[in-house]
């Protein structure tokens, strides 16, 4: 991922209202779709909370302070300060902390971008899946920034609190296999692993 500037991508407006509020992008769905849409969003948000690096309501300034001394590639997800968006990724780049909005439309999440590029960006049913995709994509850092370009890497999440040993083990297992039900483990433990199938 590449940014031409290290300037924040969203303004430091007041705290956003909760997702699903009247007038937000998700409210454009037909009336018959609203319960299903709400259920999808609720499931996505619950999964995001389970990840441990969703900070909820946090201003641009607070995110910058949290990331200021972190290594490049450290990131967190928070509620967007912009009323048209649900969430924002705040990440430490080589030029300092910056922000990238997450767009939600027609039941899919994708990174916000300029119109001519937006249609080419991958879309995901899950915020965590979106983050995982870009974390894995950023593992091979072969490009060298040039011409004032700032490359944006997602490497390491900034947790709200230290994750439990169980959760860390779950992530490690996910990095090794996706065949959870083939593992010689008790069913209850397999169910726990199934609750979070990501590598980040």
List each language-model region with its residue ranges.
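Eukaryotic proteins' extreme N-terminal regulatory segments
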Residues: 35-65
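Short, structured protein-protein interaction patches enriched in aromatics and acidic/basic residues
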Residues: 73-97
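Short aromatic-glycine-(Arg/Gly/Cys) micro-motifs in beta-strand/loop hairpins
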Residues: 39-45, 96-98, 102-115
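Cullin-RING E3 adaptor/co-adaptor recruitment helices
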Residues: 101-106, 113-200
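Eukaryotic beta-rich interaction modules
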Residues: 54-61, 66-73, 80-84
